[in-house]
């Protein structure tokens, strides 16, 4: 880096041309996130039968507040129960069951990896998001590109476009705003039932027990996978003020609107 570049990055006079990104600032990360955890238990019974049921639900947000990542969410709903029945002095039976619904939603891009590995001035000479009002009003070719863009981000009353360089056509901020989102879904079910016979009339201490059990689990991922264009700015200074006088587009905006399903898996184990 030249002394001039070092000065401009440290001075912060134009953070959109000379970025100095703090990935851990409150601009991108919440100080806290919400988590809700609710559990209810029901039990009862009499001389011949006893039952127990547990119903639980939790919902958890995320620290991130950028793009689709602001909607990151994990939820889990679980129901578990069992019934024990004494049919008579010689026969007992039981049923246990459990089912779980698990969903995890997330925006594209690995923010924490970027925070740990990316330089604070990445991509060099262009912040990931640049306000459109930094473009010279007379730069008609640049405005034509911006007006045709499918990814103009509005924050705090200003419009931003996705920026980068020819060497860096993607970045984590653009991913979170424009690359789409994904959801991982898991469903689990366990069931077992058994009957126990007391055969002491045949032989003292002799019992017979039969069991049937099912363990079923399925999981899959759904996603909306988008492509996006970034714009490389050319800067000029007029009367001491820096403006963007030209933009070069890298890539294309593509949103099919189709939901993709992948990673589907299902397993079932039966026991008799």
Regions picked out by a protein language model, each given a short descriptive name:
Residues 8-18, 24-31, 66, 70-71, ...:
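Extracellular/periplasm-exposed beta-strand and loop segments of Gram-negative cell-envelope proteins
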Residues 80, 87, 92, 205-209:
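Transmembrane beta-barrel domains of bacterial outer-membrane proteins
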Residues 1-17, 89-117, 183:
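N-terminal, post-signal-peptide soluble/periplasmic segments
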Residues 1-3, 100-162, 217-248:
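A surface-exposed, glycine/aromatic-enriched loop/edge motif typical of exported proteins
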Residues 90-106, 237-272:
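C-terminal low-complexity, acidic/polar tails when present
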Residues 1-66:
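Residues embedded in well-ordered regular secondary structure
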Residues 30-50, 55-57, 96-98, 157-224, ...:
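Outer-membrane beta-barrel transmembrane strands
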Residues 69-84, 211-216:
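Short secondary-structure subsegments characteristic of cysteine-rich extracellular domains
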